[in-house]
Amino acid sequence: MTGNHEIYLGAERALAVARRAGIRVLEDEMTVIDGLQIVGVGYPRRGEPKDNAAAVRGIAGFDPGRPSILLYHSPVQIPEVKAAGVRLQISGHTHHGQIFPVGWLTRLIYGRYYRGLNEEDGIAVYTSPGTGAWGPAMRTGNTPEVTVIRLKPR
């Protein structure tokens, strides 16, 4: 799914590059693997807000009663996507602040969802700080990571 940087570069161009490289892009669509619904919701174009819960509910074949993961660039609209049937959201966007002291700002904006795994009332949200940088090619005062998530049936 797209994020803000793909929008900055030109979403269609970025999507075409990914697809030419053989990457399956879930842009407001879903795939099902062993009964697990994996939903990708693309970042809003031209800065207009996006209703992620409506996007999830509008995806053909989405069943709120089945296990599901939402891939969305920013850790936002958590109660709404939970109400739509999502049980795990995986996001990024915050870069964990990237350069000290910006981490304080991301914590202020995204609250407890600014980094790591947070579980609340039937939904888990994982926000990856990522490994890269935006703007200056540097990271200070935070720890980049490559995340491995192992899912186990309940």
Identify the function of each model-found stretch.
Residues M1-R154:
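Soluble catalytic domains of enzymes that build or remodel membrane lipids, polysaccharides, and related
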